[in-house]
Amino acid sequence: MVKLTNPPKSPKELGFDEFPSIGIIGGSGLYDPGIFENAVEVQIHTPYGLPSDNVIVGRVAGRVVAFLPRHGRGHKYPPHKIPYRANIYSLYMLGVRSIVAVSAVGSLRPDYAPGDFVVPDQFVDMTKGREYTFYDGPRTCHIQIGLEPFTQEIRQILIETAKKYNRTHDGGCYVCIEGPRFSTKAESRIWREVFGCDIIGMTLVPEINLARELGMCYGLIALVTDYDIWVPHQPVTAEAVEKMMTEKLGIIKKVIAEAVPKLPAELPKCSETLKYACV
């Protein structure tokens, strides 16, 4: 195991000839992608504490890639307790500049069925008490990601790849709730009928905010596991979520393994997020 308290000065400290420019964040059920060659575990102490688990660094189709399980192996952290800042900063310290995240979500519309993939293009934040920014002062920055919160180039690669293996929807609005409880019927009706959202989850925010604050590109492939609570006699349960993730895990790994080598290492439009953001 490699232990770090500062960004590595050379990729040789990790046992590779280049830094991992691509990062994968695994969601519920995806604690080890099982697609790496020459994998090494890296324990990273960040200014924001330890991430949810050690970062795994290895090669995928020749590219050096980093992987971090969002909840930690064994699902140690519920959504509202995930160390989001440490997670994102640990990947940034290793050289990651583009992130592909995987999440389980509920569907808020009938045509986004359990078992489908969704590659969202917008989100609504309904979380309440998380650490949302790296800029708590004395420097203040207001990032503008509203037009394209999810990086289009990453989205397109995920969509094209996922469609080969599974029914996949291009676009959708993800409403992120605080959790860890699921929605009430009244809340679910608001997300669907008032907000016009398409999928619901608990982990996108502040993960996406933090990545974009550091100039990182970000894309998400979401697996629909349930219909939230709005379909009669089909209320969501943790058991149902876990069961669907287990059924689709092999396909998710195939999509990641095929998509990752095609991803851009870095895009100027992502790194320029802070260009006019700080006051």
Curated annotation (Swiss-Prot):
> Can you name this protein?
S-methyl-5'-thioadenosine phosphorylase
Q: In which pathway does it act?
A: Amino-acid biosynthesis; L-methionine biosynthesis via salvage pathway; S-methyl-5-thio-alpha-D-ribose 1-phosphate from S-methyl-5'-thioadenosine (phosphorylase route): step 1/1
Query: Which top-rank group of organisms is this from?
Result: Archaea
Q: Which family does it belong to?
A: Belongs to the PNP/MTAP phosphorylase family. MTAP subfamily.
Tell me which EC number(s) this protein carries. 2.4.2.28
Assigned keywords, A-Z: Glycosyltransferase, Purine salvage, Transferase
Residues that coordinate or bind phosphate: S28, R70, H71, S103, A104, T203
Subunit description: Homohexamer. Dimer of a homotrimer.
**Looking at the UniProt record for this protein, which Gene Ontology cellular component terms does it annotate, in alphabetical order?**
cytosol
Q: Where substrate is bound, by residue?
A: M202, D226, Y227, D228
Provide the species name.
Answer: Pyrobaculum aerophilum (strain ATCC 51768 / DSM 7523 / JCM 9630 / CIP 104966 / NBRC 100827 / IM2)
- Write out the catalysed reaction: S-methyl-5'-thioadenosine + phosphate = 5-(methylsulfanyl)-alpha-D-ribose 1-phosphate + adenine
- The answer to keyword Transferase applying to this record is yes
CDD domains linked to this entry = MTAP_SsMTAPII_like_MTIP
Recorded GO molecular functions are: S-methyl-5-thioadenosine phosphorylase activity
- Which residue positions hold the site described Important for substrate specificity? S183, A238
Give the matching Gene3D superfamilies. Nucleoside phosphorylase domain (3.40.50.1580)
Which principal EC class is assigned to this enzyme?
transferase
Family annotation (Pfam families) = PNP_UDP_1
Lineage summary: Archaea, Thermoproteota, Thermoprotei, Thermoproteales, Thermoproteaceae
Role played: Catalyzes the reversible phosphorylation of S-methyl-5'-thioadenosine (MTA) to adenine and 5-methylthioribose-1-phosphate. Involved in the breakdown of MTA, a major by-product of polyamine biosynthesis. Responsible for the first step in the methionine salvage pathway after MTA has been generated from S-adenosylmethionine. Has broad substrate specificity with 6-aminopurine nucleosides as preferred substrates.
HAMAP family according to UniProt: MTAP
